[in-house]
């Protein structure tokens, strides 16, 4: 019996020892680098504090540890997922080196500092930031950075390639940079404009004494060496929210907004003594184009009489889409662009540099923030590992009295500043209505004064003010197009354009069937590209489609040029015959005069956004009342109406009608020919793919020694500015077909388009003929394959005649370059069938 008891006891002891060993393995400290580990739990520190020991105690303690059996570590209590670990010593040292700030090390910091670090980590977590922004409003902004040059660089940097990078401070995602520029004579001239789209969150004034507060939106700017990444020239931080505040304050105080900030930052390190010149600007990309920010003074809690950076309290009101407000008349004086007063120039002092040596150690430059931010920098790795959270449902409770006042009428802006007045405070509604009536009376007076100024010719309105209003209108119209898809009535077709009245006298909205798809979500069938050209949706099958469907094919049109009379008169075929005299340089000349932007990999929305943004920036720089942005929208509307007007009648009857009345603008010459051009470029695609039924009638040699039309050209925009007139007008452009279903891959080669028009008894222009042509060579196999692939995929491809195949086999060994062309004339206000012209040999 005693033996059984002793045996069971030994087995229990062995089992207990195994359990203790297993527990120790489970709860022992992981052997992983702490700096790279992330956990999702909040570790609660132990309250026990280790006691101080003497040297004598250490010996006894060491002996006791040798005799004591190691016990398993007690398990930590955790609250998932709320955990934020304090920064490590390595990260603290990096921050000290980069920003030259004195930071305590973890072992030197007290328990209160540890709690502070823990709190910062929690508030920088994306779900928490999403909850904090529930009561805030969001502004969509476009930051424009015009990189001018890096000047006064040391002579030792000549030949070094430099670039400028701009990115959000908290993350490296979405960073943009300039093209490399080589330093020459101590200067690197970039002359490039960068764009970054972002959101700025702010809390509007609540009418209780608290002004509007913006959330910091810092951006990081720095110069870098392309061929020497280890070089550092200094980094600078600009807060976009501060720029918005300054612009709003100056607008409310002086009546003129800040259009541009000139920045000149001193460089450090190897480029000490040099400076980086930039021009910063921003555009509010909201429905109202930013007009509401500068007109609704109560929204930001500011009054026109308040000084800059001194927000006065007021009661903001929100307007419905049907309401309106008349801003106070703007001041006629406008100051020039100004620079923030402080925080820009470098304050670091570095030793001089005589020569550029990449081997010597360089000093770490400090970041020079323009505005001092209280919030810590958010780390890019945190944004990558944490998922994005958005608040999908939120609401704000309103007081019943406020709802009653809002239903009675729009609440006007009131100052909360208390003054001694003998009023009856027992009836706040009565006081509110009196204030409201006073505000409405002021608005009516301002409206009458504006109408009177317009009747007098608008002498009091300056050119810069007209630029502001046109820019706001352009942005508002463009952004409304992006959000009105559910109505399925595009704004392009709702405007009454002269061209639609001249063509068919019938609005596009009257047509019950749609034959053109949109290029993107609610942006229409025509958009302008960044280089000033156009991207046009096509429907070569003439079938009914939905606007939300993806087009099967689009054509990208370059900027138009005009052939001057010095080139001599020439018909369509004669025009291409003389062009062929350039020989092998023909394609390079065409691409230099009528270049097109590369759209591979972009979306329709991105192309449209880049086009309107480029037009707005160009209009700002030129400071013209008739801005390029306004002309962009007008030209897009014209081409959209031309592509849609009369299409249904043409499909039903098969008759190609042309504009009956003379055209008033040279821009309409190409627009009225778009539908015929759509058919002819598809025929040209078949020629490139060797899938055409009819061969060229014969081949001719290029015209040598005659005037080349490409050498006597001028851009259409300059031709209009100089108010030139020609009896016979020839407009040239290039067209590249692209497949939207293949990320806008190029289909076939580039085609040259020539539209000829004549002046009709000083009444206007009349289109007479349309011609297209392109270079076909055996070496360009990719063009032929992409053209054939699209035609076969959509059932429009078929083999050509056997004669063409035999002819091709006979000339297999020869490298031929031919210029093919198609022509179509107008007779009795109708387009005739296009015919194939003789091919022209380029050699």
UniProtKB/Swiss-Prot annotation:
What's this chain's function?
Necessary for chloroplast and nuclear photorelocation movements via the regulation of chloroplast-actin (cp-actin) filaments in mesophyll cells, and together with PMIR1, in pavement cells. Required component for both the low- and high-light-dependent chloroplast movement responses via an abscisic acid (ABA) pathway. Involved in the ABA response pathway during seed germination. Modulates ABA accumulation during periods of water deficit at the seedling stage.
Statement: the UniProt record of this protein carries the keyword Phosphoprotein? yes
Q: What happens when the gene is disrupted?
A: Severely attenuated chloroplast movements under low- and high-light fluence, leading to evenly distributed chloroplasts in leaf mesophyll in pmi1-1. Severe defects in both chloroplast and nuclear photorelocation movements resulting from the impaired regulation of chloroplast-actin filaments in pmi1-5. Reduced response to water-deficit and abscisic acid (ABA) treatments. The mutants pmi1-3 and pmi1-4 are hypersensitive to ABA during seed germination, but not pmi1-1, which is hyposensitive. Chloroplasts of pmi1-3 have altered chloroplast movements in low light.
Output this protein's name. Protein PLASTID MOVEMENT IMPAIRED 1
Residue span, C2 NT-type domain: 131-284
The annotated regions of Basic and acidic residues compositional bias extend over 365-381
Ranges of Polar residues composition bias in the record: 30-58, 307-336
Q: Which UniProt keywords apply?
A: Abscisic acid signaling pathway, Cytoplasm, Phosphoprotein
Which parts of this chain are annotated as the region Disordered? 30-65, 88-116, 300-412, 450-472
Give the tissue specificity. Answer: Expressed in leaves, stems, cauline leaves, and flowers but not in roots. Present in leaves in both mesophyll and pavement cells.
Question: What InterPro entries does the annotation carry?
Answer: NT-C2, PMI1-like, PMI1_PMIR1-2_C
Name where it's found: Cytoplasm
Principal subcellular localization: cytoplasm
Q: Which organism is it from?
A: Arabidopsis thaliana (Mouse-ear cress)
Where Phosphothreonine occurs along the chain? 404, 410
Q: What induces it?
A: Repressed by osmotic stress (300 mM mannitol).
Compositional bias segments (type: Acidic residues): 456-472
Single Gene Ontology BP annotation: nuclear migration along microfilament
One Pfam family linked to the record:
NT-C2
PTM Phosphoserine: at which residues?
A: 314, 328, 407, 507
Which GO cellular component terms, listed alphabetically, does the Swiss-Prot or TrEMBL entry include?
cytosol; nucleus; plasma membrane
**Range of residues in the leader sequence:** none
